[in-house]
């Protein structure tokens, strides 16, 4: 799957570098701590058109972003990959109007992609085999904090050798698409020892799943499919 997405992206080409206003970056870690201090689970709520099987209109994107903000999400994740996930760069810009930190979620393999749209955070996937240090530095130069995603022990080891402050453990195997919450539970202790901010990704469908990830050491979790079509469910998921 990954190879096909990258090849499609190469054929599509890259968007021109965006002109970014001089806005301060919205900080995920501070936002998550604020949510937790209110007795709630910090959730990065995702706008994932593929879960509905169709692209979203601009009005729908903003409605989701506003609903997530009203339900106390700590941030909004936006899929920007168009071919497989039906996302767009415009969706990230629209979601940012809701006032929360926005994570651009895509398959970033070329430095030029980091200039395509303004976001507060950007997903960097260790499995893509890019120069992590170089991409982390480039993301920060563009005003974005990287969320470095791993799925295996080897990827975690590589991530911990960088100065990434936020590491996401994806419970989904990107090759098989199988999901196993044990992945987070197995890898989390390695990251917690290093003192990084830890995000659990994929597989959270219930409040019980969310609490399980928190007990395993998650500082926040990313939830996508479960909220599409029913963003109000966030109020149930984030209750401690």
Labelled PLM ranges:
Residues 1-56:
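An N-cap/entry alpha-helix motif that binds or orients negatively charged groups
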Residues 5, 45, 68, 76, ...:
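Conserved, mostly hydrophobic/aromatic
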Residues 42, 53-140, 147, 155, ...:
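N-terminal active-site wall of soluble small-molecule enzyme domains
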Residues 48-52, 81, 107, 127, ...:
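Active-site beta-loop-alpha junctions enriched in small/polar residues
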Residues 74, 78-80, 120-133, 169-176, ...:
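Glycine-rich phosphate-binding active-site loops on the catalytic face of alpha/beta enzymes
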Residues 102, 109-120, 151-163, 194-223, ...:
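Catalytic cores of alpha/beta
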Residues 166-209:
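Catalytic-face loop-and-helix region of soluble metabolic enzyme cores
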Residues 181-191, 214, 227-240:
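C-terminal helical cap(s) of enzyme catalytic domains, especially alpha/beta-barrels
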């Amino acid at each position: 799957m990954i190879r096909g997405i990258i090849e499609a992206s190469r054929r599509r080409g890259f968007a021109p570098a965006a002109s970014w206003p001089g806005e301060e970056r919205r900080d995920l870690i501070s936002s998550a701590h604020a949510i937790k201090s209110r007795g709630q689970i910090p959730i990065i709520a995702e706008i994932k058109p593929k879960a509905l099987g169709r692209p979203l209109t601009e009005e729908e994107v903003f409605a989701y972003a506003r609903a997530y903000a009203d339900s106390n999400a700590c941030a909004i994740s936006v899929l920007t990959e168009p071919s497989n996930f039906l996302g767009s760069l415009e969706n990230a810009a629209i979601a940012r109007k809701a006032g929360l930190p926005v994570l651009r979620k895509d398959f970033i393999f070329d430095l030029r992609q980091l200039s395509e749209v303004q976001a507060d955070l950007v997903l960097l996937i260790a499995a893509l085999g890019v120069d992590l240090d170089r991409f982390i530095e480039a993301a920060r130069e563009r005003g974005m904090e990287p969320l470095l995603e791993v799925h295996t022990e080897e990827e975690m080891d590589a991530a911990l050798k960088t100065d990434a402050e936020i590491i996401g453990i994806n419970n989904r195997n990107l090759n098989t698409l199988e999901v196993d919450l044990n992945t987070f539970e197995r890898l989390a202790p390695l990251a917690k020892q290093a003192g990084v901010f830890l995000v659990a990704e994929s597989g959270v469908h219930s409040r019980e799943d969310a609490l399980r990830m928190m007990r395993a050491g998650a500082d926040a979790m990313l939830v996508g499919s479960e909220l599409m079509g029913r963003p109000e469910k966030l109020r149930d998921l984030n209750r401690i």
